[in-house]
């Protein structure tokens, strides 16, 4: 029987910690605030963004949904991100995808203030992650590691395969696993024999957005399988990248979809926002003290 690696309990714990920290900052006169920028008429995306806002409210975090519409240009989105980056009342910024066709996503990610980049999208954040310097990791990638830790699964000295190499999940997950001393293989669309790259892995992370891609043939006996994929169907179901029925009994453990990585990702975004608010509060206080000192001499 395959063990289910649910994320609800961990997500609740993370949100509770964030709520306590948010309340402490509120007592100091700083209310953590998250801004989510979207430019799409995709209803599943709008639902996801609303779920973030709802979770933020329950955690004591303000959340502004900045909806620029599906016709927004790169420059419109970029100027909004820059403005939010300079707004002292905004502590965290998320650029939600998908975006309109033709949008320069790289330019937009570069426009996110790294101090407020709570989803680790800016190249500065990603570079610091690779260099093992303090930075916010992409929340979904961090959620994968957090789930492993929560369920007592150590990547140390184990083999891991990551299917997918996006800058928001696959690549950062691979780096985080290496930092935890796993031996990591990355597979992608140009991998000629996917099963050859996955079937010997102790830990298999799948993040490509192709429902049912991974079957029993891709999974080693007893492997830990982390399914990051979430594809919405026309009737409102969420499907993972792993054929859960096919790997049941073969995989040692599997994250459910929904209810696995997703809730932890949202909780970490809120936790990052509170952390960013605390850092920005401390920096402002330090600057105020320094200004007061300078004016007295």
Curated annotation (Swiss-Prot):
Q: What is its EC number?
A: 1.5.1.5, 3.5.4.9
What pathway is this protein said to act in by its record? One-carbon metabolism; tetrahydrofolate interconversion
Residue intervals passing through the bilayer: none
Gene3D superfamilies reported for this sequence: Leucine Dehydrogenase, chain A, domain 1 (3.40.50.10860), NAD(P)-binding Rossmann-like Domain (3.40.50.720)
Say yes or no: keyword Hydrolase present: yes
Could you list this entry's UniProt keywords, alphabetically sorted: Amino-acid biosynthesis, Histidine biosynthesis, Hydrolase, Methionine biosynthesis, Multifunctional enzyme, NADP, One-carbon metabolism, Oxidoreductase, Purine biosynthesis
Which InterPro entries does the UniProt record give?
Aminoacid_DH-like_N_sf, NAD(P)-bd_dom_sf, THF_DH/CycHdrlase, THF_DH/CycHdrlase_cat_dom, THF_DH/CycHdrlase_NAD-bd_dom
The chemistry this enzyme catalyses reads: (6R)-5,10-methylene-5,6,7,8-tetrahydrofolate + NADP(+) = (6R)-5,10-methenyltetrahydrofolate + NADPH; (6R)-5,10-methenyltetrahydrofolate + H2O = (6R)-10-formyltetrahydrofolate + H(+)
Q: Domain of life of the organism in this record? A: Bacteria
Would you tell me the Gene Ontology cellular component terms?
A: cytosol
A single GO molecular function term of this UniProt record: methylenetetrahydrofolate dehydrogenase (NADP+) activity
Q: Where does NADP(+) bind?
A: 164-166, 230
Q: Name one GO biological process term.
A: L-histidine biosynthetic process
Q: Which SUPFAM superfamilies match?
A: Aminoacid dehydrogenase-like, N-terminal domain, NAD(P)-binding Rossmann-fold domains
Q: Which family does it belong to?
A: Belongs to the tetrahydrofolate dehydrogenase/cyclohydrolase family.
Quaternary structure (record): Homodimer.
Q: What does this protein do?
A: Catalyzes the oxidation of 5,10-methylenetetrahydrofolate to 5,10-methenyltetrahydrofolate and then the hydrolysis of 5,10-methenyltetrahydrofolate to 10-formyltetrahydrofolate.
Its protein name is Bifunctional protein FolD 1
| Organism of derivation | Rhodococcus jostii (strain RHA1)
For this protein's source organism, the top of the classification is:
Bacteria, Bacillati, Actinomycetota, Actinomycetes, Mycobacteriales
